[in-house]
């Protein structure tokens, strides 16, 4: 599951909370403007028009999206029928993606039996409290509440069972008796647990994504009625591969570096990547270094070093790929579906347009830009980008439910991979995102604490980090040179450091040289009936990115994350 939070993303030393760095001035949206959500009848976006793209780039991009063609489903998967009377276990249950999945299952397949929700909590009471505050009372569930009226709470509590647990512990951290009961009952496991910080400490990332995958498979083997296990990974698990990336599983021992070496020299030798060895290596390192500060520094750098050695961009994508390897190596006869979304963004249509939980990936940059604090960006303007125009969360959920029904009915002991990403069927350039942000904030500007509307400028692009850093420093410090308060001056300097670190962390993605084939998604869509394609829409080719970003995504961030203020 590809869901990326702002908290703890950067390692530079500051005690100032991020909200104080950028939200200090109480900037808010101008009340003199309103915006309209786009209609459901949207046209396909043809790239290369009115965006300053040369003809060769235009022809190349258009060729990628023209393959989609007409989809004429002759049969149906039977999505709604499959979920009837089923029992599920969902890990990472209070996360962005899992909550949208739970809402959709309850709303469209109300005859499901039980959904056990693995929740991190100190005890059962705390888990119930999180269920109430983060799910039952969430705005996300308002449509379900309208459907059931006064019986809403009794309905949802009869279906959702909170369970105290932790993905990286034996029996997933569950009480022994409860884990035995669940192992006897469940038909499906949906693994949505992950730590989505790109530069997370290596030991913590290994625990979450590698040891977590191991513990998950150990528990799955105890589930006597298990029909399918669904694991959320990320399309960026493809690492430093370039060009078109197909939906291939990772095999233990493989690495991107080894692929590149053997493609040029078949006899070349390179160490095999083994997840167990990585866990053992970090464990021994931890025991040998007694000074916590020294260990924290070494382990932080180690994750990036190991990732780059084997051909991945960062600790996150590296450990997610190893997690896939663990699942494949342990699966035996368990049917597995691995869902690899790119970047998951706000809802496109269901349960309503624009719902999002937290600032994700490029959202902080969008907000900073609207506030006049992000005058330039470190990126290739012609990079095919899955970071905002990645994939709306409801389409990831729809693909998940369709894949569950398809492979749950087949129950074939295979591992199937689905790329849920837009770069192949409906590509978006980073320059287009900037243009759409400029268009939005020119029409719907923020208002600063003095009551003045913030005027944004066209984004400048940089392909050299030194030039970009110098530009950011000069621009931001010049804008705040009149501030004499030493504390505020320090705050502005920290803003500069924050943006530099932000750009450095995202550099592999803003200059990414690959795009993600989704042939299995296409086959899934062909298997669906016309009614299923309407109710469980997975057609990413039809999204008009301008309408989505201007009419849905940015307003959704404003309403659901910023709560109408900065």
Each language-model region and where it sits:
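N-terminal Rossmann/SDR dinucleotide-binding element
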Residues: 4-25, 32-197, 201-206, 214, ...
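Amphipathic terminal alpha-helices
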Residues: 40-53, 59-62, 66-69, 112-116, ...
